């Protein structure tokens, strides 16, 4: 097939003759207007051979293979990219792109101008009209070669769209083009608009030549398809000529290539596409960067310290005590240490050698070494001069004048029956009537039977089960006896009469026996029922096999191995659901809660009777019901872990999803273990918890922290995108801090991970600061400089403040260890013995090393595990009374422990979202509690909460019950005379098991339980020990946690040091661009506050604190210098700044700090203070003289204020408030209950199952491991959810179609099959991708591409799109997708804004093909795809076949009339036999959508109902067109072409792509690419 044949192939019977070969091979010097393509390959013969083998689709992006329109994308390739339009105006660089949010809909401030669709990367020139090309004068641009497409290995794997190419009936011949053409760019389409535009406009120099295989040289470009005779190639403006269709198709193919190429070259959103890579080690780049230059910092510190023997390099010796005093005043905060001050007194010797006060070396060293240093310094006159000046400054600044002026400035910003016998008679008469007797006979019969009942009562009193009787046998025996009792009971009208006649039945022993037997039978029946229900639930959720059916009733779940296998499969199945907590509540906790509660209640109440009857306890059944959810959640965690660990470099979106999953699973696991452990207390019943359960939860925690680290540290290393990282840490700290109390080995893990993450955040903050100081960004103007400076202030201030708060929380939570020095060994041992302490013998391992453990009296008689928990720091970080927030029916399990009394009972209700729940009610005072979502809340008026006194009593009781362990390391031999406790042989403690570094002659106190009890335990121990010990330090007993906290303190110091030391770099950088004094003054204010916060909050030794104080003193001098030299003295603001700066300087040089300044610094300080005082005096308003004069002037010039605007503002606020309240009420009314359908085993006799098997056997049936997320909306016949693919973490959309019965399946099956068949063959960026189908017994899931941006209808709810260029871009994408559909033989038939979605890049996607139909070659609708075999093996047609050329009857016409009336074409409503071109009805619908985008109103918005709309459309009317102010004339003509009544005259989608209005936006989008291509090829 020749190249010309590709462009003259006529799939719809075009009778136009093909151009001759000679015309297709014109020379490059031809003067005709031509379209130019890239070279057609190196070997044309090979290319032609490939072309002959199979047709390919327009828009194919690779030249390596060829596909039809239903070809599959490469795995992982994103089907759509953002349209990036760039400006072509002179003076603007090519390829310059605006930010996605840079498009402003209009200059107005309405909500309509801030809509989402504008975020598509469209750059707007300052004058859009000048940027548009003139259609009649533009030369034909050329294009460049298409770059090689990415290989499949370079693309992130993603579920590939499923396309069916095997069924010949489903394959539609489409426009066939050459393989080389499939990857070409398009040309400027403006030349195709009018006949006069197709002229000789391209010179020969734009047409490069290439060598042909035969050695000849010719022009092998797409311009060869255009003949020299322009009249033969004329294109009517509305596509009226015969040849125009062919030309449109050719141009459509060319334009499609460039369009698809632009889609693929989009800039992806990092949230969905960027893989987050974990750091290879803990010392990440941020820490390394912040450590860069540490040597320089230490050298500076050496120069500042001048203290010998100071260990400055030890991270773990940076201020041991984490106690932050809350009583520090400002004076004490800024006091330097005496040792540091000694190193700063050299100025006394070097100040002036001529003065007689010079000090000799020997005298100087004697002064510094003396104990009365301060008194000797006061004898020096120069020191006295400084203190005198300091006193004078303090008096001035604290005087009345300055205080009054400050008050004035501060105030400037402030503004101004029947009786018993009668009822018995009725009962007797009814009884006689029912038995056909007289009343007398009935009375006689009852007396005889009543006299014979004594034997039954005696049997009950003597009843006792035999030993070793099985539960089933016992149930039969008990049931027989109980049935006798109830038959006897019917002989009396009520129990009260029976008690009166038979006193034995009134005894407590008899009633207890009856109650116990009834309860036992009820428990046996309900336990068996619930166990069978759970097993059926497990087996019933197997996925439907596509070929065979499995009888799930034959599965033996009593076999533990079989049950474990099915349980794992079941866990994997329910993991797909979006809300695991809700599933556990509805399916497990709610049905089991009352019976589990009653099981414990009745046993404790009737335990004595239980033993008398020799009843066996149903402990195995109860254990199964308790342990089943724990086993299930364990399997869920393990399965989720296996999937999560397979994902390499997850995106931020995947990380968020996994964090939500694992936090939910861990929370459920902890709640269930706590509930089971509490339930088993106080009675004989015990369960054995899986020893691997805790390990699984810890493993889940470890992975959670690994992805939390990625989530917090994901952003670029140059800046912080948000300051939410500490908030995220605080959120999960509140969630997990008590987990260590319930899960073994979790406490220390949580503590270590939180401190590690906090440390890394502080390092990142320091690294960010250093980057801004040393390598600031290029600031082009004053606005950029101001934005940069404000960003630094916000990030440093906000992050430091939040991190400080979180660090303080961690520090207090992890302080569980205090170290004392032993002063009197013998007295200490004596006191410990007398107060009941005991020696804990660990097996000799610790004792051989000189370390001994001594327990407090509270621990005597405790379990070994309790002591080991103290040693292992298991409860580190927990609350004093650890509690869990349980918002489900697990709270009912242990209701006996929560204010249960004789008046208590269970009540049930259903929440607003359909979730059932139980609550405890008291018959005397109760009202039902409300249920809000998954949270149970008591109404405040009826809440039986404990008083404050009771809560304090609980805390006090808990505190008194806690003990402590002393780790004693004496220098002397230990002779213990008190009590001793031996640990079990398997519980011995070895030195390496003691996570503590001991030092000789010390005693370490490790408290039990929460770290918040440490203060209380320390006070107790110090009262016991007296003066025999002295305090050394308080810290965490975990070495890892302690070291991390020490490193955090050092990181805070280094960050503060950098702020104060290098503030001049920030000032210099800012002053180069903007000399705004207000912002420069804020730099000094920020430095002051940053330093003071460190001194008040953070921990450091005295020498390090002194360094910060000295730097702050230098900062104060620099601040005063700035005010005196750079600021305008007449500015009122400078007065306020001077007062603040001098007060800061006075505060910093107070006390002995003033001696740390050298003479030069002190002189500069005095000079700048004098200048600032002069400035203050010029602003002083003595006795108000100046203010009175200014007030007189202001009164003369003051005008009356119009308060009308104020009232108008108040009215608008009230209206807005009412509108919001109304919206909230409407939203609450729309909340519906979500019923749940229970699956059934498939039945061969059910006709509906044939449909399921047909769908399951489809080639697009996939086996995908996924998990449901949020509800999105409803489609034509299903509900749509977002979901995550567990194999790769990608987000999908899942249309869930519920199947009620066979009739509903027969009704919706054709629609499902039709939509699947349509989606399988489609593959285009503007059509939602289809990934496959998953078939179950009660529902069908269809997997499709997820569109994050929502629907176009939701977008238009905010108003019209005021920017016409944005409307053009959307229309272009809509036409591209519609043209592809029609070229593939698909008619959508329901085009409307609700079926048009936008992905996360704002690109249009067609969706919901439930109403679409596929047209075969002969123009008839395909029906074979909707045939299935019935029960007799014959084919049954489940759809109606209609001819597109003639409608046979009204029934078929009504079936073809599908869509939404306000968007339906006239021929669709009237059932006209004149259908016009293929897809003409879609074009009408498209015009209605464009009309709505322009006007913001739905078509026919002025009509009341759909019948009126259909009447007007059928009558030949058209919707109301927009005004001239809303759209240009070109856009108006485009709408006219779309909304032509006659479908034969209505333009097709391909023709509309050549409309000037669309050509205009295409020219702006792709014009520059064409011109740049020409330059590259000529080079």
Swiss-Prot record:
The protein depicted here goes by the name MAP kinase kinase kinase SSK2
Class of the enzyme per the UniProt entry, highest EC level: transferase
GO cellular component entries: cell cortex; cellular bud neck; cellular bud tip; cytosol; incipient cellular bud site
Boundaries of every Protein kinase domain copy: 1266-1558
Which residues catalyse the reaction?
A: 1390
The entry sums up its family as follows:
Belongs to the protein kinase superfamily. STE Ser/Thr protein kinase family. MAP kinase kinase kinase subfamily.
* Keywords assigned: ATP-binding, Kinase, Nucleotide-binding, Phosphoprotein, Serine/threonine-protein kinase, Transferase
Enumerate the Gene Ontology biological process terms: cellular hyperosmotic response; osmosensory signaling via phosphorelay pathway; p38MAPK cascade; regulation of actin cytoskeleton organization; stress-activated MAPK cascade
Its UniProt miscellaneous note says: Present with 217 molecules/cell in log phase SD medium.
Region entry Disordered, spans = 1-70, 97-155, 190-243
Q: Does the keyword Oxidoreductase apply?
A: no
- Compositional bias (Low complexity): 21-44, 104-118
Report the GO molecular function annotations.
actin binding; ATP binding; MAP kinase kinase kinase activity; protein serine kinase activity
Give a single Pfam family match.
Pkinase
Compositional bias (Polar residues) spans? 45-67, 127-139
Give me the residues that bind ATP, please.
Answer: 1272-1280, 1295
Task: Name the InterPro entries on file.
Answer: Kinase-like_dom_sf, MAP_kinase_kinase_kinase, MAPKKK_Ssk2/Ssk22, Prot_kinase_dom, Protein_kinase_ATP_BS, Ser/Thr_kinase_AS
Q: Where is the composition biased (Basic and acidic residues)?
A: 144-155
| Coiled-coil segments | none
Q: Which reaction does it catalyse?
A: L-seryl-[protein] + ATP = O-phospho-L-seryl-[protein] + ADP + H(+); L-threonyl-[protein] + ATP = O-phospho-L-threonyl-[protein] + ADP + H(+)
Q: What is its EC number?
A: 2.7.11.25
Which SMART domains does the protein's record reference? S_TKc (SM00220)
Instruction: Supply the source organism for this entry.
Output: Saccharomyces cerevisiae (strain ATCC 204508 / S288c) (Baker's yeast)
